[in-house]
Amino acid sequence: CIRDRCVPPESLELIHSKDPSRKTDGALIATAYYLKVLQLMHRFASLQGLKADAEEWEDLEHRMKDAFNARFLHIKEGTSPVPGHTLYPDSIFYGNNTVTANILPLAFGLVPKNYIHEVAKNAVTSIITTNKGHISTGVIGVQWLLRELSRRGHADVAYLLATNKTYPSWGYMVEKGATTIWELWNGDTANPEMNSGNHVMLLGDLLPWCFNNLAGIRADRWKSGYKHI
């Protein structure tokens, strides 16, 4: 079962969240990553000069992208995760409007151009309003979170998440004495004997964000390795 594991639970005492609104549809995640693989295959074929292969991968990518949006993109429908709050009629989001559900399509270039602003706005609203300025993604969503927020003009929100010291955050772990990344965002209270005290995947894109966005060091995606910075 594909899912966004290690989503921070709503309580410091819980090991796993019991709130279904925090969990992202596994089918959305799996399909988004299938599309990411198609994009990579298209790029690899192009880099090697395999024109026919590149065109074949690109055609499949475009057809899958249309199917993805037909299935998971919601326009002017649904309800807000904020209790008592009704969505504005122009609200546009993916899946059940979790941060991960919106960040993945944004990061993978799956959102139709005229909807990008609204989808990004919903991701930011979920972070600031629903989650009070804290991380709510698991190991999958967090891999793209900070860089995509910055790319969409919300570097201030990315910085807030990167520097928070209250639960759930990386800073919370540090404040509680962690020298490596815990398996659980609340590993000190939920399960101090958790399986992993060095769960590097939960670091997400914090380090790439520091290199790419804070330091401004980026590799050319159309050149192999780091041949062109």
Where in this protein do the model-derived segments appear?
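Active-site core of glycosidic bond-cleaving carbohydrate-active enzymes
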Residues: 3-229
